[in-house]
């Protein structure tokens, strides 16, 4: 079972949300996504009437990002916050000419991508791999990973860089695409991420970001404890349990647009797709709760699923009320 020495750790990680806290949270909770989707995409997905599972929705979101990014004309793609690198493998399988650099601060997840790359080179569609968890979750897990790639033989070499999003170790004007697929909400300070991205992106390059956002929520941005506590209290009344279980910063769209503009980006397109993200995902979980609950209980204490379920209900409610949304943002340099 996925136990902690201190059960309060996830709450502390979520409240502080420092870089190492985010790593610890993902190492501890990424299994929930794996159990729910039977895969390692680590995104909410993009749903429509033809999609029946979270995995299909996650592939759909990756396809949407490929279209918005115009990846078919790209050369070098920097995938910032690449997680387990599964979206990058998918894009590479679609477009063999892409040079994709997977960058993440989470070394454990990068190692998973390296291991997966080795298995895909052998053209095995289903394999078992072992990934060692962090010291905060002293357990290794093994699971089946099914990679249904369009052209498996194309999913060959990806590059991996263990670095932070606010200090990108690349030369100026060195890539023509930057993608942050459901990762930028964790980057602090986010304005530094935008400035670094603008620096390494070449002239006329395309920057695409997909992330959860909130509507009409004032945020205090001073880096002191008092301001952080005031902000947390104000958010609690709107977000409820999501204040703690939504393990990221809570940005509104105007704030994001302002910081991107200050960094030198020209906004080209904004898609608000919240109704195609939160509500169908919530519906899927509610309809399949008993099965998912049993699977989760094998790896996590009972309270984890209870918190997850309450968070799912709250997420659905706030999406219907348009308090939360999901933005796909395209910009150029």
Where are these regions (language model features)?
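N-terminal auxiliary segments of SAM/dcSAM-dependent transferases
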Residues: 1-35
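A short glycine-rich, Lys/Arg-flanked "PGG" loop and its adjoining helix->strand segment in the class I
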Residues: 191-206
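A short acidic, Gly/Pro-enriched loop at the edge of an enzyme's catalytic core
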Residues: 166-178
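Class I SAM-dependent methyltransferase SAM/SAH-binding core
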Residues: 78, 87-167
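Class I SAM-dependent transferase core
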Residues: 23-68
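Substrate-binding/catalytic lobe of Class I Rossmann-like enzymes that use SAM or dcSAM, i.e.
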Residues: 222, 234-323
């Amino acid at each position: 079972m996925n136990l902690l020495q201190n059960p309060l750790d996830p709450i502390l990680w979520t409240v502080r949300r420092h870089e190492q806290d985010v790593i610890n949270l993902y190492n501890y909770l990424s299994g929930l996504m794996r159990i729910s989707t039977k895969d390692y995409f680590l995104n909410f997905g993009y749903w429509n009437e033809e999609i029946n599972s979270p995995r299909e929705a996650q592939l759909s979101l990756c396809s949407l990002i490929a279209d918005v990014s115009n990846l078919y004309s790209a050369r070098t793609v920097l995938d910032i916050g690449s997680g387990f690198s599964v979206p990058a493998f998918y894009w590479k399988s679609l477009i063999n000419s892409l040079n994709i650099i997977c960058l993440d601060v989470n070394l454990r997840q990068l190692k998973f991508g390296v291991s997966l790359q080795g298995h895909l080179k052998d053209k095995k569609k289903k394999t078992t791999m072992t990934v060692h968890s962090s010291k905060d979750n002293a357990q290794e897990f093994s699971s089946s990973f099914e990679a249904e790639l369009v052209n498996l033989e194309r999913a060959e070499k990806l590059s991996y860089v263990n670095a932070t999003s606010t200090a990108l170790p690349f030369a100026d004007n060195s890539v023509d695409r930057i993608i942050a697929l459901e990762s930028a909400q964790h980057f602090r300070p986010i304005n530094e991420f935008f400035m670094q991205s603008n620096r390494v992106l070449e002239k006329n390059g395309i920057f695409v970001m997909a992330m959860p956002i909130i509507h009409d929520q004032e945020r205090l941005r001073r880096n002191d404890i008092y301001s952080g506590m005031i902000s947390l209290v104000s958010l609690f009344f709107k977000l409820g349990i999501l204040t703690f279980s939504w393990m990221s910063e809570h940005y509104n769209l105007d704030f994001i647009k302002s910081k991107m503009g200050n960094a030198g980006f020209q906004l080209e397109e904004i898609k608000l797709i919240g109704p195609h993200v939160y509500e169908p995902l919530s519906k899927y979980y509610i309809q399949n709760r008993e099965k998912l609950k049993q699977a989760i209980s094998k790896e996590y204490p009972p309270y984890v699923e209870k918190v997850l379920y309450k968070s799912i209900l709250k997420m659905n409610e706030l999406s219907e009320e348009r308090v939360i949304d999901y933005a796909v943002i395209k910009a150029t340099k």
